[in-house]
Amino acid sequence: MRRKNQIKKRIIELIELAYNTAKSGNLELAREYVKLAEMYSRKGKVEIPLKYKRMFCRKCYTPLIIGVTERRRMRSKILIRTCLICNWQRRYVLSGNKRSDKENES
């Protein structure tokens, strides 16, 4: 258990380092950090937390920074995230608060 926690901490460190490196302009080094974190995740059988998993492109491993390497668009209740490097797209359905929706129906 202790080993998996160490691996998870290292994965998080690498992804944060990649994000900061990409912000400073070195996308190649940032990609390498993300690839290394992904490899640690696979080899150590540790899942990357969702918050960090959404910080990079699944196709080219580039950290997604709004306006620099990522474009965000809203269509109705759908958020579309597009990587500006490889044009990979991910769609998220945004739902409102279910409790308030039920109260409005009554």
UniProtKB/Swiss-Prot annotation:
UniProt EC number: 3.1.26.5
Subcellular localization: Cytoplasm
Cofactor binding annotation: Binds 1 zinc ion per subunit.
Annotated TM spans: none
Keyword match Signal: no
MF GO annotations: ribonuclease P activity; zinc ion binding
This protein's GO CC annotations: cytoplasm; ribonuclease P complex
Matching InterPro entries: RNP4, Rpr2/Snm1/Rpp21
Cofactor: Zn(2+)
Catalytic activity: Endonucleolytic cleavage of RNA, removing 5'-extranucleotides from tRNA precursor
Residues binding Zn(2+): C57, C60, C83, C86
Signal peptide: none
Main subcellular location of this protein, as a coarse class: cytoplasm
GO BP annotation list: tRNA 5'-leader removal
Assembly notes: Consists of a catalytic RNA component and at least 4-5 protein subunits.
Function in brief: Part of ribonuclease P, a protein complex that generates mature tRNA molecules by cleaving their 5'-ends.
Family statement drawn from the similarity comment of this UniProt entry: Belongs to the eukaryotic/archaeal RNase P protein component 4 family.
Protein name: Ribonuclease P protein component 4
Organism, scientific name: Saccharolobus solfataricus (strain ATCC 35092 / DSM 1617 / JCM 11322 / P2)
